[in-house]
Amino acid sequence: MKIVFIGGRDIHILGGIESYMLNLATQLVKMEHEPIVFCESDHNGEEFVNGFRVIHQKGFNSNLICKPWLGLKATLKTIRHIHDADIIHYNAWPPSLWSPIARLCGIKSLMQGHGLEWQRSKYSPTQQRIMKFMEWLTAHLNRNLIMCSEDQCRYFKKHYNREATAIPTAIYL
């Protein structure tokens, strides 16, 4: 199965999503799948890491626009150049805004939620309202939802009447 991951930062600068994609893609290669990872980076280019293809896309200094823009670029590149992709795995809502385009081209997709971003105190009230709207939009645009916690699944069921599957990606200490 050819699985395209869209939505992380540079895979060499390990954060939560990046570590998750690196480890999952590495295991998928061992199971004879073909993962392809698009990541935000400080340069454009391609490389192979642990047997899977990594496509670096240069981002720019606007968090509000950068991730949706890179999600669109990665979705279009998948449609145009990765003709036999079986599924696109979007990490978080910004890149998943383009999942309807993938579906129109016959590619299945899923969106993995990594938290309720608008609740984080680091964002201004205006940013929180925009994120809340984007969450609503994501809930309605994406057909297949997975979340990192049961709490997020319950939230999406309660507020959007959307079923989501919980797949915890962290470790338990």
Specify the residue positions occupied by each region the protein language model found.
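A short beta-strand/loop micro-motif in the catalytic core of glycosyltransferases
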Residues: 88-89, 140-149, 165
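Membrane-proximal helix-turn-helix segments that form the acceptor-binding/catalytic region
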Residues: 104, 127-145
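A short, histidine- and acid-enriched strand-loop-helix "catalytic/donor-clamping" loop
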Residues: 62, 97, 110-127, 141-144, ...
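An aromatic- and histidine-rich active-site surface loop
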Residues: 69-75, 80, 87-118
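A short, charged, and often flexible helix/loop element on the N-terminal side
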Residues: 51-77, 118-127
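Carbohydrate-associated surface elements
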Residues: 151, 170
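Extreme N-terminal starter segment of soluble prokaryotic enzymes
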Residues: 1-4
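N-terminal strand-loop element at the rim of the active site
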Residues: 6-14, 20-21, 27-65, 152-157
